[in-house]
Amino acid sequence: VHVQLNTKSKIFSSDNNGFGNQPNSDVGAITMAHPGTLPLVSKEVIDMGMKLGIALGGTITRNLVFDRKNYFYPDLPKGYQITQDATPICKGGTVKIRRDDCPHFDIKLTKIHLEEDAGKSIHVKNTDFTNLDLNRSGVPLLEIVTEPMIASSEQAGLCLTELRKLVRYLDISDGNMERGSLRLSLIHISEPTRPY
């Protein structure tokens, strides 16, 4: 689950973090990785990551370490993404599903880590053209990684609903899925004896 954070600036620069602004108007030298620029992580982003980790019962890491994930994609102007891999801001934790209309269950978390978002490709209808809006590039994200224990689409939906309520309650994200503030990537893992 990717959670876009409600911050005034981007994760590693003072560029504006706003939704719906004129395309490519909130992109500065650090976001573009111009020579001589150095990223500096936002304290506000760190605080939000710790707040969510504590709320989910995880263990907060004492040292922040960031990695470069290198890949080429048109909406990634630097050619790499700054993320956390081996040393996430939070390890473990649990999303507790407690509702009257279904059995109670827990979804265990592997980690919560900080990273920057990529830009946005906008495919122009009825043409072969794709436009790029790099305003989203560098926007702070929390990525929540669960253990492979979600057994159904219903459980996935309940987990996402609980996370959405929590990030809104903690005021770290508006959780607006329509605007991309809360995004979900599913990976299907099946047992060898039970394919799909």
Please state what every model-predicted region is.
Residues 2-185, 190, 194:
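Basic, nucleic-acid-interacting segments
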